[in-house]
Structure formats: C-alpha cells, structure tokens
Amino acid sequence: MNILGIDPGSRNCGYAILHHDPKKGNRLVEAGLIKIKERTLQHQILEFVEGIDLVLKNHSIDEVAIEDIFYAYNPKTVIKLAQFRGALSLKILQDLGNFYEYTPLQVKKALTGHGKADKSQVAFMVKRLLGLKGEIKPLDITDAIAVAITHSQRIKLGGIPT
C-alpha cells in the first residue's frame, strides 16, 4: 500500500510517499517539496494543486494522510492556509474519494511517544524508523514523512479501515 503524506503550507508543501507492507514495514519511495512562488493567492493555490496532481499522476497512491492546520496567531495566515487546505481536500476527494487528517500533536505522539516533542526529535525518529542516513531538509519534507508514518501505524494497529 502506498501512502501519500502531505504537510500543506502556503509557501512550501512537503510530500512523502511511503510504501507500507504489514509484514516488511515501511519504505520511503519518494519525498519532495512543492515550492509555491510569490504570486496572487489564486495562482499560488493553482500551483499548489497542480503540484499535488503531478505527484498523484506519477505514483499509485492508495491513501492520503494530511497534517491538520495548526493554530496560528495571525488570522490572515489561518485563512490563507484554510484556502490551500480546501483546494487540497477537493483535489484528493476528486481523485481518491477520501483522506485522513492528523494534528501535529497526534503525529508527535505517534513518532516519539509524547505530543510535546520538538522538530528535531520528530526528525530523529523519522530517520530511525525508516533507516535513513543524513539530514532531511527542509522540515516540511520531514513533517510529510512523519504524517505518512503516523497513518501507517494507525493502519497497523487496526485503527483505520483499509
């Protein structure tokens, strides 16, 4: 089963494709970044959706896991992120019919055992769980991988119908 993990953002969107095999574990297939240029909001959203579309067309994706919007102090930032999330949700629903959402707290808890972990602790566990060497940059990619791992753990524990 291939899981697409997505860390949506208005400037960069991290994505990761994780192959989940219940017997052999997880293997990272691909991870990358969709960079969004400074343009009008409408063009940024279009560029974002086109980037996701390209990933979906180039890979056989079975399930999608998305990191939920975190709390931001700036209401304009929340509104902008919500617009990106709405476009992403529509695209995934049109192509696959369903997706799963995980809060940053759920992701941190799934990978490190507690919800107060910092980004470096999450990055360490991502590398350890997948047997990766070197640093994964930027953190948007690490977060996308972490979301995909969280989803695979939920499947393994029987918490999600497949």
UniProtKB/Swiss-Prot annotation:
For this chain's record, the cofactor binding note is: Binds 2 Mg(2+) ion per subunit.
Which InterPro entries does the UniProt record give? RNaseH-like_sf, RNaseH_sf, X-over_junc_endoDNase_Mg_BS, X-over_junc_endoDNase_RuvC
Give yes or no: UniProt keyword DNA repair.
yes
Question: What subcellular locations does the record give?
Answer: Cytoplasm
Named cofactor requirement(s)? Mg(2+)
Q: Spell out the subunit comment.
A: Homodimer which binds Holliday junction (HJ) DNA. The HJ becomes 2-fold symmetrical on binding to RuvC with unstacked arms; it has a different conformation from HJ DNA in complex with RuvA. In the full resolvosome a probable DNA-RuvA(4)-RuvB(12)-RuvC(2) complex forms which resolves the HJ.
What this protein is called in its record is Crossover junction endodeoxyribonuclease RuvC
Q: Which organism is it from?
A: Wolinella succinogenes (strain ATCC 29543 / DSM 1740 / CCUG 13145 / JCM 31913 / LMG 7466 / NCTC 11488 / FDC 602W) (Vibrio succinogenes)
Its gene is ruvC
